[in-house]
């Protein structure tokens, strides 16, 4: 119920009284100063709705995930500049970043995605707010502002749905990477998909 509480009213308020005018209000976080916008409003309302349970840094989830106390979570917004996926996780996950080379073509592994924690390690990637990662992955055009990341050239990040709306790509790559372990230690894998709309029916021939 907490996750379903209203967020858009505060976001709409910020659009009308802040984002459409000069953004003069600022806030400090971990030694840096940022301007308040509707993205800030989204995170603030989300934290209030969820009673602060999600108000954590990325690195705070590392040990609980590593010790299997909580499920491993992978967030992958889309980099607008080049269409690649930005993979965010407390764990090292470079194995999700590459496409294997083709057997009939001599070429190197292709970097299909960028691992956030490795790429931005000198910019404090571990200190990323978890709600900021969620917001990057749900940045729908006009509703929330594009996220700008400190790279050169600057990465612009938007909704994960631009590339992989249901996380199928990550799931398949994860399954393929650990297929031997899964075969030896489990009875199988179950995929659970949570959709925001009904699945389209197949068209009869």
Identify the function of each model-found stretch.
Residues 1-205:
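Catalytic domains of lipid- and phosphate-ester/thioester hydrolases
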């Amino acid at each position: 119920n907490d996750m379903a509480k209203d967020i858009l009213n505060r976001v709409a308020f910020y659009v009308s009284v802040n984002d459409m005018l000069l953004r003069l209000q600022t806030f400090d976080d971990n030694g840096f100063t940022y301007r308040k916008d509707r993205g800030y409003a989204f995170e603030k309302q989300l934290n209030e709705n969820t009673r602060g349970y999600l108000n954590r840094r990325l690195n705070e989830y590392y040990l609980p995930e590593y010790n299997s106390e909580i499920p491993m979570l992978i967030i992958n917004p889309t980099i607008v500049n080049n269409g690649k996926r930005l993979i965010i996780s407390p764990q090292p996950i470079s194995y999700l970043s590459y496409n294997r080379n083709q057997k009939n073509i001599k070429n190197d592994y292709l970097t299909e995605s960028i691992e956030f924690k490795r790429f931005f390690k000198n910019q404090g990637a571990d200190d990323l707010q978890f709600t900021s990662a969620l917001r990057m992955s749900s940045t729908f055009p006009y509703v929330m502002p594009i996220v700008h990341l400190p790279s050169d050239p600057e990465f612009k990040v938007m909704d994960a749905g631009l590339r992989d709306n249901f996380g199928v790509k990550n799931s398949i790559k994860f399954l393929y990477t650990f297929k031997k372990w899964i075969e030896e230690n489990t009875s199988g894998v179950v995929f659970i998909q949570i959709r925001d709309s009904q699945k389209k029916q197949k068209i009869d021939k």
